[in-house]
From Swiss-Prot:
GO-annotated molecular function: RNA binding
Family: Belongs to the rotavirus NSP3 family.
Location in or out of the cell: Host cytoplasm
Annotated region (Dimerization), positions in chain: 147-203
Keyword RNA-binding appears in the UniProt entry: yes
Role description: Plays an important role in stimulating the translation of viral mRNAs. These mRNAs are capped but not polyadenylated, instead terminating in a conserved sequence 'GACC' at the 3' that is recognized by NSP3, which competes with host PABPC1 for EIF4G1 binding. The interaction between NSP3 and host EIF4G1 stabilizes the EIF4E-EIF4G1 interaction, thereby facilitating the initiation of capped mRNA translation.
Oligomer status and interactors: Homodimer. Interacts (via the coiled-coil region) with host ZC3H7B (via LD motif). Interacts with host EIF4G1.
Name of the protein in question: Non-structural protein 3
Coiled-coil features, chain-numbered ranges: 163-234
Region (RNA-binding): 1-146
GO BP terms in the entry: regulation of translation
Disulfide bond sites: none
Organism of derivation: Rotavirus A (strain RVA/Human/United States/D/1974/G1P1A[8])
Length: 310
C-alpha cells in the first residue's frame, strides 16, 4: 500500500504546476511576451534541481514511506524516528522551515555537497599560527557511527567549481566600451559642431543679405524723399505760374477769385493728393468752358446765326 507516497508525489507535481502558472501569470501582468514551452522547460529544470539538491523531495517521500510502512504493520522506521517525532505540529513546522532553507540555499547555488560539508566540519583557527584545526561536528560523528562515512584511498584532485572573475579582461572590456562610447560622443559632437558652423555661416550670409536690402531700402527711401521734394517744388511752381498767368488775363474778378481758391486748395505736401486736386481743377475748367460754349451756341441760334468749327 503506497497511498501516502502517491499523495506526496501528487502534491509535488501540483506544486510544480502552480509554479508554472505563477510564473506565466506574473509575466502576463508585467506585459512581457513569453513562450509557454520555454517557461515550462526552465521552471521544470530549476524546480527539479532545487527539489532534488535540497533533499526536500526525498525527505517528503521518506516520510511518506515511513507512514505507509506503519500502515502496513512495519513500525521500524517510525520507532527509529520516535525521539524527534514528539509533537506533530512542531515537527511539521520544523520540516517546513528546513525545507524552505534548503530550497533557498539551492536556488542561491549552494548545492548539497557544500551544505553537507559545512554541517559536518568546522574550522578552528590557532592564535599566532597560520595553521588551523578541523573539527568534526556531531552530525559527522553520527554518520561515522551509522557507517555513512567511506574512506577513499585514491586521491583525486578535484578543482572546486568557483566562479572566478578575470578582472583584467573585464577592465579591458570596459575600456573598449568606454573608448567606443567616447568615439561615438566625439563623432556626435563633431557632427554638431559642423552643423553649428553651417548654421552660423547661413546666419551671417542672411545678415549680409538683410544688410544689403536695408541699404537698398535706405537708398530707395532717400530717392523717394528727393522725388517727393522735387514734386512738391514743381507743384508749388505750377500753382504760382498759373496764378500769375490768371492775373494777367482779362477775366472777371469773381472768376479769378474762384480759380485762385481752387489753386490754393491744392495739397502741395502730398503729391498724390495734389494730382487729384489738379485733375478736379481741370475738370471744372472744362465744364465751365462747355457751359460757356453752350450759352454762346444758344445765343447765336436766337439771333438766327449759324456757326461752324474749322
Amino acid at each position: 500500500m503506497e497511498s501516502t507516497q502517491q499523495m506526496v508525489s501528487s502534491i509535488i507535481n501540483t506544486s510544480f504546476e502552480a509554479a508554472v502558472v505563477a510564473a506565466t501569470s506574473t509575466l502576463e501582468l508585467m506585459g512581457i511576451q513569453y513562450d509557454y514551452n520555454e517557461v515550462f522547460t526552465r521552471v521544470k529544470s530549476k524546480f527539479d534541481y532545487v527539489m532534488d539538491d535540497s533533499g526536500v523531495k526525498n525527505n517528503l517521500l521518506g516520510k511518506a514511506i515511513t507512514i505507509d510502512q506503519a500502515l502496513n504493520g512495519k513500525f521500524g522506521s517510525a520507532i527509529r524516528n520516535r525521539n524527534w517525532m514528539t509533537d506533530s505540529k512542531t515537527v511539521a513546522k520544523l520540516d517546513e522551515d528546513v525545507n524552505k532553507l534548503r530550497m533557498t540555499l539551492s536556488s542561491k547555488g549552494i548545492d548539497q555537497k557544500m551544505r553537507v560539508l559545512n554541517a559536518c566540519f568546522s574550522v578552528k583557527r590557532i592564535p599566532g599560527k597560520s595553521s588551523s584545526i578541523i573539527k568534526c561536528t556531531r552530525l559527522m560523528k553520527d554518520k561515522i557511527e551509522r557507517g555513512e562515512v567511506e574512506v577513499d584511498d585514491s586521491y583525486v584532485d578535484e578543482k572546486m567549481e568557483i566562479d572566478t572573475i578575470d578582472w583584467k579582461s573585464r577592465y579591458d572590456q570596459l575600456e573598449k566600451r568606454f573608448e567606443a562610447l567616447k568615439q561615438r560622443v566625439n563623432e556626435k559632437y563633431n557632427t554638431w559642431v559642423q552643423k553649428a558652423k553651417k548654421v552660423n555661416e547661413n546666419m551671417y550670409s542672411l545678415q549680409n543679405v538683410i544688410s544689403q536690402q536695408q541699404n537698398q531700402i535706405a537708398d530707395l527711401q532717400q530717392y523717394c524723399n528727393k522725388l517727393e521734394a522735387d514734386l512738391q517744388g514743381k507743384f508749388s511752381s505750377l500753382v504760382s505760374s498759373v496764378e500769375w498767368y490768371l492775373r494777367s488775363m482779362e477775366l472777371p474778378d469773381d472768376v479769378k477769385n474762384d480759380i485762385e481758391q481752387q489753386l490754393n486748395s491744392i495739397d502741395l505736401i502730398n503729391p498724390i493728393n495734389a494730382i487729384d486736386d489738379i485733375e478736379s481743377l481741370i475738370r471744372n475748367l472744362i465744364q465751365d468752358y462747355d457751359r460757356t460754349f453752350l450759352m454762346l451756341k444758344g445765343l447765336l441760334k436766337q439771333c438766327n446765326y449759324e456757326y461752324a468749327c474749322e
